[in-house]
């Protein structure tokens, strides 16, 4: 029983080590948040144009 447990434990450690070694770093692409305004006639939301947004932020 102890030998079987030892074998399973070693196999688990080897599999865990293989997962860690072969893991690729996750390169998360951070999306720029967009600000929205009410569309023409209230038909939903549309993104604020960047030039208008920059002008408002720099005022």
Swiss-Prot record:
Tissue expr = Salivary gland (at protein level).
Record keywords, A-Z: Hemostasis impairing toxin, Platelet aggregation inhibiting toxin, Secreted, Signal, Toxin
Domain of life, per the record?
Eukaryota
Cellular component GO terms, alphabetical: extracellular region
What does the UniProt entry say about where the protein is found? Answer: Secreted
Work out whether the entry's keyword set contains Electron transport. Answer: no
Signal peptide: which range, if any?
A: 1-23
Q: Describe its assembly.
A: Interacts with human F2 (thrombin).
The job of this chain, per UniProt, is described as:
Anticoagulant protein that acts as a competitive inhibitor of host thrombin. Inhibits thrombin-mediated host platelet aggregation.
Task: List the protein's name.
Answer: Salivary thrombin inhibitor XC-43
Q: Which organism is it from?
A: Xenopsylla cheopis
């Amino acid at each position: 029983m102890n030998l079987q447990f030892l074998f399973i434990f070693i196999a688990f450690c080897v599999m865990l080590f293989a997962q860690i070694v072969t893991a690729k770093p996750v390169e998360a692409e951070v999306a720029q948040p967009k600000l929205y305004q009410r569309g023409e006639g209230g038909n939903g939301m549309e993104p604020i144009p960047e030039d208008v947004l920059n002008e408002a932020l720099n005022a």
